[in-house]
Amino acid sequence: ELLQEALRYGKPDVIAWYENPYLKKVRQLYAGQYSTAFDMNELPAKYLKQFPELKGIPIEYQDHHYTHAASGYYTSGYVNAAVVVIDSIGEWETLTIWQGSGGKLSRVYSQGYPHSFGLFYSAMTQRLGLKAQEDEYILMGMAAYGDADRKYNGITLKNAIMKELGIQTHSNKLHTFKKNLHRGCNWLLPELHTEQDMFDLAAATQEIYEVMLDRVIKLAKERVSFTENLVMMGGCALNCTANSMITSKYGFKDIWIMPNPGDAGSSIGVAQKYNSTSWNLNWQSPYLGHNIEGDYPVEKSLKALLDGEIIGIANGRAEFGPRALGNRTLTADPRGPLIKDKMNEIKRRQKFRPFAPMILEEDVHDYFEMPENVTQSPYMQFVAKCKHPKDFPAIVHIDGTSRVQTVNQLQHPDLYILLSRFKEETGCPMLVNTSLNIKGKPIVNDEHDAIEFSKHYNVKVFTSD
């Protein structure tokens, strides 16, 4: 279905890939991942053979970290910017800093395997009994329940982790690792196994990552000193808690994180390599996916919300990226004391996890202490202290923060109307927002998915008014 949609624009001249699989295999051999390295089934050329429509079209490979950097820089609208890419690993690189200037990108710093902040975070995700490369956001949420400075054998837990994993701090460069973490670290501190132990490990992991990120941002400013604009890309850019710590650090005043900063979003950077029309992609919206046509269900949604119901909204184009931003959303009144537990039950999630608020942009500062230099947060990329946490239990974490989505008339006029109408009726300018799916399942995409979700989980899903 996806291929047929793409072919509507004509047969492609080239198939471009977001990494070089052959360089990747060299690195896998170096790391001792022999079964993976010698598995040829994952090669793009092998995979694409199942599509006869693509026969004979040449395949070209792009540098993985370049595609991340390009996806961020060319959608930012900045002429000049420092671009930071942090992920688990590309072909070899795990962290890069780029200078964006006048439409050109140049690499000014590179750190390679096995020294990977992303692999560290994923390995610790696995250590907590979660799924690496998938559940890192759960670790981030768990951190608020833990104590990173808890004593362990006479030292703090975060120092114990750094010691055991061989994480070293250098005066003239970033952190490095003695341990290779691509296989995880289930062996780490085995005597820690209680629920509170897991929370404490999560807190220590998050704090270590924040210290690492702080040094990266400082280095980025040193290497690209002539700009106040910062672009962050790679899967680690989804760590909204850490993002909120660096919004005013080292002279950066404007931060852009493309709403899909992980590998899926790097497709934009790949395509831009072949775009000779303009280097500025003039980013307009993350609503780029499948379109459910019809009027946005303002009236139906408003009535159900005022009746205290938890509802789904599936209308318009699906969001490009991991965040639900109003078009594939499970929502409710955030003031109800039982809403969080009820929604977590529907979503099959851990009970400790809160939900995000979507709020009228003009009201955000009345309810949240936004990070410095962050005037709007349309893509849920930062956390903010809630000024009235007891009034909105569904959207406030244990540490008093919320992952805020601001909504204005330009970015989403229909959602803006719904929030405005809800405010008129209740005095509350916000609603709960979480993705319209069950944990581990795909998000609702089309009308059929919406019907099935409603049927299986007993939730009204409105696709139009």
Regions flagged by a language model, labelled:
Residues 19, 234, 259:
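Residues that line or immediately flank small-molecule/substrate-binding pockets and catalytic motifs
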Residues 59-62, 191, 195-211, 408, ...:
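Short acidic-aromatic active-site loops that bind/stabilize oxyanions
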Residues 203-228:
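Phosphate/ATP-binding catalytic cores across multiple sugar-kinase/actin-like superfamilies
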